[in-house]
Regions:
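Short helix/turn-capping signatures at newly exposed starts of structured segments
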Residues: 1-171
C-alpha cells in the first residue's frame, strides 16, 4: 500500500498505480481491479480501510481517502499531495479549480467544492487548537510540546479527501 501512486482526477476517476477506478464504474469491475471491499453500513472499504467507496445501484458514486497524513495512502490532486501539503495550500488550489460555489458551513473543518465534486475535512482548526492550549494553561494543566505538535498537525493537514459524481454535493 505504502508505495502506491494515487492520483485523484475530479469528476472522472482515481488512478491507483495506473489502474482507473472511474466514477460510475460497476462495483464488479472495481473489485476485479483492486480486490473485494469490506462492507460496513453502506460503504465498502479497501486498502486496510484507508479508502472507501460508496456505490449507488452498484456503480461508483463517491470515493474517499480516510487516512490523512499518517496513513498508508498518499493521494495527489492537481499535482499536490492531498495529505502532506499544508491544508491552506491545497484549499487555495481547490478554490481556484472549483471556480464557483463552495459549501464551507462547518467553520473551517470541511469544504465541499460543488463544481469539481471534491470534499475535504480537517479534524481540528488552528483557532480551536490555540483555544485548547490557552484553556489547558488556564486550568493549570498546560499541554506538552508533543500534544501541541499533534494537534497542530491535525489542524494543518487534511484528514480526508473525497470525490463524487457530478452534482454529488448539490444533493
Amino acid at each position: 500500500c505504502e508505495d502506491m501512486n494515487i492520483e485523484i482526477c475530479p469528476l472522472d476517476k482515481v488512478l491507483v498505480d495506473g489502474e482507473a477506478i472511474c466514477l460510475g464504474m460497476e462495483q464488479s469491475t472495481v473489485e476485479a481491479a483492486i480486490g473485494k471491499g469490506i462492507l460496513v453500513g453502506k460503504r465498502y472499504y479497501y486498502f486496510n480501510d484507508d479508502m472507501a467507496i460508496d456505490y449507488n445501484d452498484n456503480k461508483v458514486d463517491f470515493i474517499e481517502f480516510l487516512s490523512g497524513i499518517d496513513g498508508m495512502l498518499k493521494p495527489s490532486i492537481y499535482g499536490i499531495s492531498a495529505f502532506e501539503s499544508q491544508a491552506d495550500d491545497l484549499l487555495e488550489v481547490l478554490k481556484e479549480k472549483n471556480n464557483g460555489k463552495i459549501n464551507d458551513t462547518e467553520n473551517g473543518y470541511s469544504y465541499q467544492f460543488q463544481n469539481i465534486s471534491v470534499g475535504v475535512y480537517l479534524e481540528a482548526v488552528p483557532e480551536a487548537v490555540k483555544e485548547m492550549i490557552e484553556e489547558a494553561s488556564g486550568f493549570g494543566n498546560p499541554m506538552t510540546d508533543d500534544e501541541i505538535q499533534y494537534e497542530m498537525k491535525r489542524a494543518n493537514h487534511w484528514a480526508t479527501i473525497g470525490l463524487g459524481v457530478a452534482g454529488y454535493y448539490q444533493r
